[in-house]
Amino acid sequence: MLNNTNVNNGDLVSRVSRQMRISRILIITFFIAYTLITLFPIYALFIRSFVGTKHATDLWLTPPPLEEASMDYQWGSLSVFYNLDSEKAKADLGIPADAYIQSRWTLARIAKEYDIPEQKIKDYFTPYSVYSGWIVLFTDNKFWPALFRTILITGLSLFGLNILSIMTGFGLAGLRRRDQMFVFNLYLLSAVVPLMMILLPQYMIVQWLLNLIPGYGVSGSTIRNVSQIAAIVVLNIKGGALGTMIYTGFISTIPKELGEAAEIDGASILQYFRHIVLPLLKVPIATLTVMVLPSLWNEFMGPYIYLDANNTTLLPLIQSYTGTYTTNYQVSYTGIFVSIIPLIIIYILFRNWFIQGAMSGAIKG
């Protein structure tokens, strides 16, 4: 009887162990599939950056092969479809800078007119069939300044938004007085006001204030460029309802006894804020950062309206590559892919910090 019981127990343990292994395999398979499905759009976007306008309606899972440039291509068509920098192309091919090339001239005629070997022209234009987006984007002298301005505006906006939200949350923490509740409700009210409702008056006020700055009217001046960037940062950090909610809720959970003990020890409010409150705010800082970083980085409307074309950020620059009659989709896809790389790098480097903030929800339990 004892042996039979041991056998039955062994079979039961074996079945449970087998079921657990199967469950573990299914769970791992599910998460692998989910990860692949999540990453596929990024992979598809990367592949599309190599697919020219000619094949824009086709589905490609790998980069297409290079297509040798035909000598029947017209100069004007290449300029439109490849966003070709005519002056740079003429310099690279050895064509005089003051030479006038008609848009209907074929590459064969250009080779004959300026005594250029046909193979040299083919070798020059063939990479454009696949790498047009990358060539145009990284040789455009507007791209790197636009990337720098995007990083600058995002960084300053994040810093300013966190600082102002922390100070507001510290002032409203506890909501013990009626005036504190009134101010807190005003912040919440600002979150439900549509941007389009205040866009025009906001634009008029900002332009009026900017025009008060000496030298702002000079196009391309440093004062004008810096003032426009400062205006974008101020608009990004004003009225942070989300940050106020997060920091007010978190700071309210800090025991009052800490403040009373600091006061007894002779600490001022500023010292209490700096040495006790601030070190406890790592989690809400991560929470607010992970929630607003994508929207700040991908902001289009503000820079498009308030920044000049030579002082813009990434997304308006990418939009400027869209033509009136045709669009080089390689440039658009390449620009979008490049614009998300910094975000991916940031989330990879600070993933533990962000996960901690997202899981805790900035509420101390």
Where do the model's predicted regions map?
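Compact, charge-rich alpha-helical regulatory domains located at protein termini
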Residues: 73-77, 100-105
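A hydrophobic, multi-pass inner-membrane permease signature
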Residues: 2-70, 77, 81, 91, ...
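Short, solvent-exposed alpha-helical "recognition" segments
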Residues: 95-101, 283
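Amphipathic, charged-and-aliphatic alpha-helical interface segments
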Residues: 87-97
